[in-house]
Amino acid sequence: AIHDQGLRIDGRRTNAGDDGGQRIPAAIHDQGLRIDDRRTTAGDGEHATLTAIHDQGLRIDDRLHLVGGQTGEAGGGASGSAHPICAALAEHGAMTTDELRKLVPDLTLMMLDELEQLGMIRVAEPDGASGGPKTDLLLCRTDATPDHRPGERQRLIIDFLEQHGESSWDELRELYGLQRGQVRALERAGWLTTREVPVWRDPFRGQRVEPRAEDPALTDEQAAAVGEILRAHGTPAQRPWLLHGVTGSGKTEVYVRLIRHVRALGRRALILLPEIALTPQFTGVMRAALGEEIAVMHSGLTPAERRDQWLQIRRGSIGVVIGARSALFAPIDDLGLIVVDEEHDPSFKQNEGVRYHARDAAVMLAAATGATVVLGSATPSLESLNNARRGRYGLARLARRVQGRPMPTIELVDLRDQPPARGDREQPDTPISVLLEQAVRQTVDAGEQVILFLNRRGYAPAMACGDCGESLQCTACEVSLTYHHRGRVMRCHYCGFSAPVPRTCPTCGSDELTSTGAGTERIEEHVVQTFADLRVGRLDRDSARGQGLQQTLQAFRRHELDVLVGTQMVTKGHDFPNVTLVGVLDGDQSLRFPDFRGGERTYQLLTQVAGRAGRGDRPGHVIIQTWKPEHHVLRAVRDGDFDGFAEAELRLRSRQGYPPFGFAALVRLNSADQVALTQAGAQLRELLTRPTSPRVHVLGPTDAPIPRVRERYRTQILLRSSERTPLHQAAALVTAFAESLRATDVRVSTDIDAQSML
């Protein structure tokens, strides 16, 4: 929505340059986020708002106290919406934020923050809470020479302070066994003064980064991109920028130079990344280039670390904030630059609770704060590309890799002609072709590394009976159970159900159960069995739990692994200079999805994973195994022809009226009662197709691609329109319809600009 004509926030549409636009950052920061382009049934938004408040540093069990007997008259500029808070506290006394929310349903962090700063309320943590910053006691030698004669150990402390200056009590306690009582005695005697300072928890877990010795020289393309963006910064010509750079072209260095510029102007920067897996490497590069004034915000932090980061950002001691999509709501004043790296990535879309697209919200936030927003990608979304072509966005291109490194060569291997490599007795055929297996051997023998990509975790996607042909199904979802070799367990990747592998077929009693297909576990096992001398690692959601993610990435980066098998977690943004071979085991996988974005997703995914090869001194090679080597998307990937692919895809979208040439909303309905769901779907279609209803094209209702999840049946209706307004009007009808179903089990939600049809 923001990509196009502006996003409706707090019930009003706002465009860049709107005089009232300065209210938007507050609305975004408090994450009350009343976005018209998000329709949910009661409860979804409520839960999301509470979660957002908790994530931003306000605990739901914090106690709120009214200060000085205020009666609810919010003076000093407090907004009128804050009055009910003071009134509730005056009537009911101190209460937790969760209790207050029940009395003031629209409670947001911004309201409480405003009242706290005005001194009208006081926020106190519950007993035993450890969310605030730790403190350290600093000791400093005074200029006085008191009459008090210090003892031997006290003399050591005084001498140390005279020699080293202000020092930590923790340090002196470790060196000399200094006790608090001795500190108080010296302070009373006048030998020293003390002060407490906050000690922030380290989100980098002690990982040290060496500062850059010198900056790399910019290529002509990088220098031109930096110059173009900075010339427009802070002028009437300022607009969002699309930085379209091939993999390895140095987009990160462009970000560094832009950040330095806005920091020199006294403003701050926000960088959004699609995956927390990218954060450690990316922050390492930024810390080396920019210093330590960097905060990170993502779900991988502990609650205490997240709170410390939030408090430092709020106090203004942090110049650069890096994080996943939720970092968009960090309390950053004086915002000068927003970078959305890998802007095409679908994980920037929040699909639960308050639905929003972080890229689009970043564009709106930049317009409201006067910041420059840069959207970076090697494979831009067609929406962003279309905006650049129409002049709404500026376009800066990096067409070549840095240091003259060549792009990797890409080879399409036709699986119809290429025999599979030898497998084991249970599964004689493997998804690895003989050609790819030979390439792995040659690459490792040359002292180089390999990435094998398969976007399917587990050992096998199904287990079937050799006699009756039935596969093991989830009892709560209409999907096959995935076989996980570790623990010999069948697991549903949608609801989390798991069960041991049965000894016999539940349908016919046969003991001829065999796993079919392959996931990353099986590929890892096959490589280990085939190449006993190779060091093999795996990176997927199962192996990445806890510290597994960073341990695997660090081991691969240090060349403690020869081959890394992984899902799409290995495709995004990683820089492994010694990787020269990438093997894609199933190049057709995302083409099979029932989604009009299937071709775009395939091009992006394959180009991104191919970009991991040849980023160092040696050229890279990519082998993509496919059953459809003639497919135009795969040919475009092979040829590195983004422009040709985009042109063909945009022509197709234009003929069909799909985004970016039209607008779409996906209405999802679900219920445990299939009959009630069918009736609700028919009623909603009838409502939307009445002559008096907004003029939108209604497709459905139809079963969702996965018709049942968590014991709830699912159906969906696709709404399409050439204009935003009718779509918003139709969404309002859906919301009213959902309200009428409150007493039933049918749940309804509307996803504007849905990124997935699943």
Language-model features: locations:
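Accessory, non-ATPase domains that flank or precede helicase/AAA+ motor cores in DNA-metabolism machines
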Residues: 1-377, 384, 389-405, 444-445, ...
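Inter-lobe coupling/hinge segments of SF2-like helicase ATPases
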Residues: 213-227, 236-678, 686-690, 694-696, ...
